[in-house]
A protein has these predicted regions:
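Acidic/His/Gly-enriched intrinsically disordered linker/tail segments
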Residues: 559, 563-640, 644, 671-672
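Bacterial N-terminal signal peptides
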Residues: 8-19
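Zinc-dependent metallopeptidase catalytic helix centered on the HExxH motif
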Residues: 369, 384, 393, 518-595, ...
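Flexible glycine/proline-enriched surface loops and loop-helix/loop-strand junctions
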Residues: 372-377, 468-470, 547-548, 615-625, ...
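Amphipathic alpha-helical substructures
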Residues: 285, 618-620, 625-737
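Acidic/His-enriched low-complexity segments
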Residues: 24-484, 488-496, 626-628, 671-674, ...
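Catalytic zinc-binding patch centered on the HExxH motif and its immediate surroundings
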Residues: 492, 497, 505-519, 524, ...
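Positively charged n-region of N-terminal signal peptides that target proteins for export
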Residues: 1-5
Length: 806
């Protein structure tokens, strides 16, 4: 796996050395939960400090205070927080990123994050306490208003964000992190209540904000109207910017979970889901005393969903012995406190008993049950860590279970006549697994791959027509599409590695492509949209499962690739015109305005940000940007690479796509069962492009310029060609002209196809390498063309493309 990339002025993250450890004395085994309890209580018994124009700087956050600090009592001989009452100002400079600058403007209407405030809650495990002047000694009662602020702080923060900050602080102490973290919540100013976090080990950004591209800092606020927090700004540390490199978040993972053995009790699905997850893991950091896990992340505050439906911990065992754990109401995770410190390569077995109302019932389907979140029902450490799985489900005899992997057991429960036990096994390492429960009908056939090898079973888990209040699903059609699309992608992208494939019906308006099993909405009409939908989810076997995305910034490698894969399949399965219509709709989606809470926003979705920003493109002022950019623009960017890897003298589709298919198959093989970054893909693309016909014709042997323009920037050019035809000797002609490239930076360049149509429905193809505002060309042809067009098939993404004969 690639370990380092540079930070261009603002978009990519890179990997460097992990943080140094402090040389503090180790915490004794019985101290961890006491430390947590003291931090969570947040009692202001640490004395007070009046200040006037006192300035405190933490990374890019500058704060000025006039008033009084009331400090928490010491924990492990250190102060971990304070409440400020008075008047103050703060300023957080926007990092050197065009997206962050535009994002801040879009969300708060300013060029920098600035505000006044009257109260502030500060929590830390770094050296913040050393920056204060001497304070009054411990003891004594704090001011009543400060005590009220402290008393309500932790519970409210956990409710709004899912973050248990006290647990994060305690973990930082017992694991001896250095540097530690810093958090401050401001309130009482013109921006109301908002928060700033600097977490050098990335734990809160990864677990609770899905920000894992190396960013250590966040500025965010809870938005009641959307029932979740909204990130105003994310940033690397000041040292990262100075070095030009930063650590990917997964460098700081404490453990690597290699196997899950899960017992799932589905015997009372109307009431609750109960399970025991036994995790086999290897420790990957020194002196680990506490391990955080995410669970139920993504559940919102709407109708108290996270409070009412979260899976609650009922017990924890480490290597067979009971162990301490913490999980608060509203928390989207848990922390396990080990009985003693463990170091690298130490194997651990951790068992967690969980129970909660985590199954959802849909009125459209009677007797079928699905997790409230298909991706958050098992505890996980880090982001998309891979493991193997043994999943045993105990359920009513009238139900059956669909899940990932191979079904290796389905038989009556010897301890209860009315129950069944069904076991699935996933022997390939994967990141996410899912299940569905209901009176499914299983429809089966086999998939035989053209490349040879043993056939694999294919199953579609369909609800009986009488169970659903929606139109019946034609199982033969779904099975045929699953079979066709799987074989097609295996032929062009490389070997399908799993021992089975299938899908389960779910009554929701989206699909999800888990390893070996798709969750499919009702779709069985022989139409382009259906072909594209099923094949998109099938393509996730390669783009997302076989090859995962390294960080949220790289998710276009999954969704954009699956989207374009579905276009290729649909053009073959139906007709080229259907694929052209899908591409047209994708291009059109970029030109529409973003949606806001009050209606249509300003500008175009294309301009919200580059595709490298992943889910952060969506906000309360830019709904729809993630779908338009990561899915659709990501697909169109891959389509342009398809053209660049082809022979410009031939139709890339008709000619067999050799260069493109070889590149994609090589990418799969190099990162099989691994995660890839955009830079990883760029390296593969560079190798394959260097000797391509387009590279030879244009004198360009690498694609760094292409990724800079289309992945890291937001440009959307318009092209227009003006040409004329002059007769030459012996019936030949000379075509000369100019291709104009508008609305993009002056250094923008792009090879653009030109197509000539001759009598007899014959065609000729060439390419113009456009650099800057315009480029001229001349081409000699053996006969006069009936028509000349600039990129009539839309290989190059543009707002508009036009051709004029002079």
């Amino acid at each position: 796996m690639r370990t380092a990339i540079a930070i261009p002025v603002g978009f990519c993250a890179a990997l460097a050395a992990a943080a140094l450890l402090r040389a503090d004395a180790p915490v004794q085994p019985d101290e961890a939960t006491r430390i947590y309890g003291a931090i969570r209580a947040f009692e202001l018994t640490g004395g007070s400090l009046p200040v006037s124009d006192f300035t405190l700087t933490r990374d890019r956050i500058e704060m000025t205070f006039t008033g009084t600090f009331h400090f928490a009592g010491t924990v492990e001989n250190r102060v971990t927080g304070a409440v400020f009452i008075g008047r103050g100002t703060m300023r957080a400079a926007v990092p050197p990123s065009e997206f962050e600058r535009d994002h801040v403007r879009r969300l708060i209407g300013a060029d920098t994050v600035e505000s006044d405030f009257t109260t502030a809650v500060l929590r830390w495990t770094d050296d913040t306490i050393d920056l204060f002047p001497a304070r009054a000694g411990e003891g004594g009662a704090p001011a009543a208003d400060a005590a009220r602020v402290a008393a309500g702080f932790e519970a409210r923060l956990t409710r709004e964000t899912g973050v248990n900050l006290a647990s994060r602080l305690a973990l930082s102490i017992v694991n001896r992190e250095s540097p530690g973290l810093f958090f401050v919540q401001f309130e009482g100013g013109r921006r109301a209540r908002f928060n700033v976090l600097v977490d050098h080990q990335h734990r809160i950004p990864v677990s609770h904000f899905n920000v894992n591209g190396g960013e250590k800092g966040l500025v965010f606020a809870y938005r009641p109207i959307i029932f979740r927090t909204e990130t105003w700004m994310a940033f690397y540390s000041a040292d990262d910017y100075a070095r030009g490199t930063a650590t990917y978040s997964d460098v700081h993972n404490l453990v690597d979970v290699t196997h899950y053995d899960v017992d799932v009790d589905l015997t009372r699905p109307d009431e609750r889901l109960s399970l025991t997850a036994r995790m086999t893991m290897n420790v990957s950091a020194p002196d680990v005393r506490a391990i955080p896990f995410i669970l139920g992340e993504g559940l919102s505050t709407y109708q108290d969903q996270r409070l009412q439906h979260q899976l609650h911990v009922r017990g924890v065992r480490v290597d067979g012995a009971p162990a301490a754990w913490t999980q608060e109401d509203w928390e989207s995770g848990l922390t396990i406190w080990l009985p003693q410190a463990v170091g690298p390569e130490r194997p651990l077995t951790v068992e967690v008993d969980l129970d909660g109302r985590f199954l959802q019932v849909n009125d459209l389907v009677r007797g079928a049950y699905y997790p409230i979140s298909n991706t958050a029902w098992l505890p996980r450490h880090g982001y998309l860590d891979r493991a193997t799985f043994d999943l045993e489900f105990r359920h009513r005899k009238r139900d059956s279970v669909a899940s990932v992997g191979t079904r290796v057991r389905e038989e009556p429960d010897p301890s209860a006549a009315d129950l069944m036990i069904t076991t699935y096994q996933m022997t390939d390492p994967v990141a996410l697994v899912v299940f569905a429960l209901g009176p499914f009908e299983r429809h089966r056939q086999e998939v035989t791959f053209e490349s040879g090898g043993d056939p694999i079973p294919l199953e579609f888990h369909k609800l009986p027509d009488r169970q659903a209040r929606i139109a019946a699903v034609k199982e033969d059609f779904v099975l045929a599409e699953l079979d066709n699309s799987l074989r097609y992608f295996a032929a062009i992208f490389g070997r399908y590695p799993y021992k089975s494939f299938g899908a389960a019906f779910h009554p929701y308006p989206f699909g999800q492509g888990f390893p070996t099993m798709l969750m499919l909405a009702p779709a069985d009409q022989a139409a382009g949209g259906t072909f594209a939908f099923i094949s998109h989810e099938t393509a996730h076997q390669w783009w997302g499962n076989i090859v995962a995305w390294r960080s949220y910034r790289d998710q276009w490698l999954s969704e954009g690739f699956a989207q374009y894969s579905s276009v290729l399949y649909t053009g073959l399965r139906d007709k080229p015109q259907t694929a052209a219509e899908l591409l047209r709709d994708m291009r059109q989606s970029l030109l529409g305005p973003p949606r806001t809470l009050t209606g249509a926003g300003r500008g175009r979705l294309n301009d919200v940000g580059p595709i490298i920003l992943g889910h952060r493109l969506n906000s309360s002022q830019s709904f729809g940007a993630y779908q338009a950019l990561v899915y659709n623009k990501g697909a169109l960017v891959l389509r342009m690479l398809h053209y660049l890897l082809s022979d410009p003298a031939a139709d890339p589709i008709v000619s067999g796509d050799g260069g493109f298919n070889r590149m994609m198959a090589a990418f799969v093989e190099e990162f099989r069962d691994d995660a890839a970054s955009t830079d990883d893909f760029r390296a593969v693309a560079n190798r394959h492009f260097a000797s391509s016909p387009v590279a030879v014709r244009t004198g360009t042997n690498q694609l760094n310029w292409f990724f800079r323009q289309w992945v890291y920037q937001t440009g959307l050019p318009s092209y227009r060609m003006e040409y004329q035809v002059a007769d030459q000797a012996e019936g030949a002609v000379l075509v000369t002209g100019t291709v104009f490239q508008d609305n993009v930076p002056a250094d923008w360049m792009m090879p653009v196809p030109v197509v000539f149509t001759f009598d007899g429905d014959r065609t000729g193809r060439s390419v113009v390498h456009v650099r800057g505002a315009s480029s001229t060309f001349e081409m000699r042809l053996p006969m006069r063309p009936r028509n000349v067009q600039l990129d009539p098939d839309g290989w190059i993404l543009s707002e508009r493309t036009a051709t004029t004969r002079k």
